[in-house]
Amino acid sequence: MGIVNVTPDSFYAGCRFGPREAVDEVLRQVEAGADLVDIGGQSTRPGSDQVPVEDELRRVVPVLEALSGRVSIPLSIDTDKARVARECLSAGASVLNDVSALRNDPHMVEAALSAQAVILMHRGGDSPKTMQDCPQYRDVQGEVMAFLSERREAFRSAGGDPARVLFDPGIGFGKTLEHNLSLLKHLQDLARLGPVVVGVSRKSFLGSLTPDSGPADRLEGSLAGACWAALQGVRVLRVHDVRATKQALAALDAVLGAD
């Protein structure tokens, strides 16, 4: 799953695009081998503020409309707002990726019913602005799994097909370094719920493991995290660097398939 942020303030400067540039980037990622591309019009990095609905729509809807008929892979909309979800699903997106797990907007569960797939993510704290203030868990794995199971049930209770749900533990969203590493180590446990989505690409916890100068310095750690997640049975890897990740996974597959 490639990442395309139609935002001026994404944490990774290499993935900040205007609408026209975003279309080109989606096409580049498709050529590089992306199986799915996630398009977002609001940064959800730690400390970020909410973007008005109209601003978010102005960023992402033109991208989806411009891609209509030009790509054969599914497109995902990364939003926590029901109106944005509805309009983007009408404009060509088929997957809804909600970092609030359908909680931020009271109408989001209903909006999600028209998506072919729904990604529910765990986020500690009330919002991206405050989620890293003081993350605390007694049992991070158990609490994340219980939360995601409850959100799937909320979707099912509203008439949604639970088979359409994918689960994201929310690496870097309201978690300390230790929380992130524990969740990654035990991804196989999370996979008992269903298909898992993981995004470690360029995130700050990688910079805590080895000295770096920022997100641009974290490709190698991102590839290591992607390969580990794949070994744990993760179905969807959310990445900025599609070509490099595909190459790393191809090498991993070759080793695993050798006699």
Positions of PLM-derived features:
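Active-site-adjacent loop and "lid" segments of alpha/beta metabolic enzymes
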Residues: 10-26, 44-67, 71-74, 79-83, ...
